[in-house]
């Protein structure tokens, strides 16, 4: 009886609205530090007026909408845009859609299952391409909706290659949070903590980059999350910044200012000897 009740659409809608309110409360009561020098410079330099792909791991889904709220205030060109978040067609996707709607985000229903064979996957890809070709923003969790954790599906590389849109990778962490026993070890922020947002400079995936695009997204997302987690771990020792916290913040700033990767096409990568002779 109780299990049937928790799966009822009205119950899920109410629970999602309550979670959305909670996530908004946690975001507003957390003292955030944004590390995004390279990304902010690129957006203010004109990229904000065109298509943008924002990627973050599924485990940081509750920390994703807060980045948009923060960046929209820093980059005026982003203000009129409403990001489209890719979610699954399963009921958990509908649940997530209700949560992110609290932050002014919209949803595209599809999936990103490994191997590219997924219900609604091709339709979702077409929908995202339409958004990007119209100059919009698409947010994706490359390891969602079912994992494996921190393993990017091919779809994000394909989307970037087909659209030509720059990819921004994002990680965040807080000093006060819970970790769920889910496949992704989802992070739920608690109110009244401190947090770090790490947004890395954008990179473009060439049409023939192949596996390199997917691998780059995976590596950069993990680096961003690890940098944020290292800072949060150091910052938990007390309310005042210590040497460990300062060092972790400096490392995150260096990462966020690093030049983005320049991806070669698979054809060029397969001829290293010819490239060296040239």
List each language-model region with its residue ranges.
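A short N-terminal beta->alpha junction/helix N-cap motif
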Residues: 6-10, 48, 52, 84
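Catalytic core of membrane glycerolipid acyltransferases/transacylases, capturing the structured
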Residues: 51-117
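A short, well-structured juxtamembrane/interface segment
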Residues: 24-51, 63, 69-73
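Flexible, charged surface loops at secondary-structure boundaries
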Residues: 44-49, 77-80, 132-133
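Short, solvent-exposed polar/charged micro-motifs at secondary-structure junctions
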Residues: 41-46, 95-96, 119-122
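Non-catalytic C-terminal accessory region of glycerolipid acyltransferases
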Residues: 2-21, 27, 81, 101-106, ...
